[in-house]
Amino acid sequence: LGTATAYPAWSPRENRVITLEDRVLNCFMRSCNGTRPPLGSEVSVAVTTYVTSLSQGQSLRMNSKRPVGPGAIKLLAVKPDQADINRGASLYHSRCAECHQKDGQGDKDNPPVWGERSYNDGAGLSSVENLAAWLKVAMPLDDTNLSDQQALDIAVYVNSQKRPHFDLLKHLPTKAKLGEYNASPTK
């Protein structure tokens, strides 16, 4: 809720101001490991409209350095070099596998967390620090009680698994369908 209140915003990755629609479309490429829909396409407008509807009544939260919505997640105090991958594996199997499956592939209600259908190595969650911070505030669903160390251990385990490589040019539609893109095609 409130995500739309952070846009337009400066994006260091794209090195320019982006709109909510830009952000949504870029998630198709990185977090969903798919092709970026064209700007103004039916799916683009539908998803952006939905996200905006979830932000109704929220105050605008502009930030000149990066997008910051009401749910902005602060990085944890623990650092990746303090992680224990074996402890992370054990925690994953006892706390996460019920929904995301032992093999990390998820099911019809829960997304995969590694493998060919998961987020790629260009997604924000492919950073151990980002994933740990997100796990701390969002997982397990409806019972967010992981310690900072547990979130970090699970993050290092999950991100040690195979996932698709992000290649920007392979995630863009053809030039004829692209419309305006918000970054250099070399990033």
Question: How would you describe each model-predicted region?
Answer:
Residues 162-187:
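A cross-kingdom marker for long, charged
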